[in-house]
């Protein structure tokens, strides 16, 4: 079922809002991820497409990236404080728990129950806790197992890498959304879609590795068309899902960027690479408003 494949990548696409474990280190090749510049007479905005989680040792920084970041006086990310675990827990308590839910094992097909039980054991989350969670929340709670299997580390992701030294330098960080906003994207999904999401988390590790490798390879090469194809393959089968996770958010961000041009300064915007690729990308929406984004890497 196509929706199952979509669900398997949703947690990765929105990984900034999910609980994530550490993993072992490993050397990885570098790359040249895509970057754009939007500017007028007194304002420059850099747009950099990120990967929220990466393998340790992945070398993705370039001189052009470092120059753009160093010249900026404001950093904008999807979420301003990625380390706010208390805030994330509070948002999860508010949105992710409901009374009277069926047991978590009853929310997947019979042939997936054993795999789900094994993942629960690997995650170390009590089944009784997951039983009280809405299906999307339980899927996110288990997503850390997938990240670990893929060899990913939240501390190696683009945002975490640049956030700490930026804050240490006393420069401001702004979030386009909050953790609660991102959890809310999942909370509004129909139960059928939430269960497909859970099945996708439980599905074959080999499939997840193959899909993620394609995404990571396109990102590292700066292959924007490849990124767009990956996200199109995963989301076009569900227009409602794509609208919620991509299109409406991109429109809001494009509106914010256009208004930000009214104030002088240099801004570095780091958001998930999928938002900067495809027909409903942030850049396309800016272009529709007469604002041009020029690729600089």
Regions found by a protein language model. Name each.
Residues 1-7:
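Bacterial N-terminal signal peptides that target proteins for export
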Residues 14-16:
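C-terminal motif of bacterial Sec signal peptides marking the signal peptidase cleavage site
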């Amino acid at each position: 079922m196509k929706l199952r494949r979509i669900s398997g990548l949703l947690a990765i696409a929105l990984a900034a809002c999910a609980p994530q474990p550490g993993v072992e280190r490993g050397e990885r090749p570098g790359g040249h991820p895509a970057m754009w510049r939007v500017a007028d007479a007194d304002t420059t905005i850099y747009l950099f497409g990120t990967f929220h989680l990466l393998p340790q040792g992945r070398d993705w920084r370039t001189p052009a990236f470092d120059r753009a970041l160093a010249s900026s006086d404001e950093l904008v990310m999807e979420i301003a404080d990625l380390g706010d675990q208390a805030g994330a827990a509070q948002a999860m308590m508010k949105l992710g728990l409901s009374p009277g839910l069926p047991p978590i094992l009853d929310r997947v097909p019979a042939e997936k129950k054993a795999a789900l039980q094994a993942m629960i054991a690997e995650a170390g989350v009590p089944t009784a806790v997951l039983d009280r969670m809405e299906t999307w929340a339980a899927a996110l709670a288990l997503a850390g197992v997938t990240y670990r299997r893929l060899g990913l580390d939240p501390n190696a992701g683009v945002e975490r890498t640049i956030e700490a030294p930026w804050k240490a330098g006393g420069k401001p960080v702004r979030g386009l959304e909050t953790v609660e906003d991102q959890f809310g994207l999942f909370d509004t999904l129909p139960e059928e879609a939430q269960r497909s999401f859970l099945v996708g988390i439980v599905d074959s590790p080999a499939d997840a590795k193959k899909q993620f490798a394609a995404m990571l390879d396109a990102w590292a090469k700066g292959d924007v068309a490849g990124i767009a194809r990956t996200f199109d393959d995963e989301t076009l089968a569900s227009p409602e899902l794509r609208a919620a996770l991509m299109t409406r958010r991109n429109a809001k961000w494009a509106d914010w960027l256009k208004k930000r041009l009214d104030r002088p300064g240099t801004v570095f915007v780091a958001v998930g690479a999928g938002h900067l690729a495809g027909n409903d990308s942030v850049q396309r929406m800016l272009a529709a408003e007469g604002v041009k984004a020029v690729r600089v890497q």
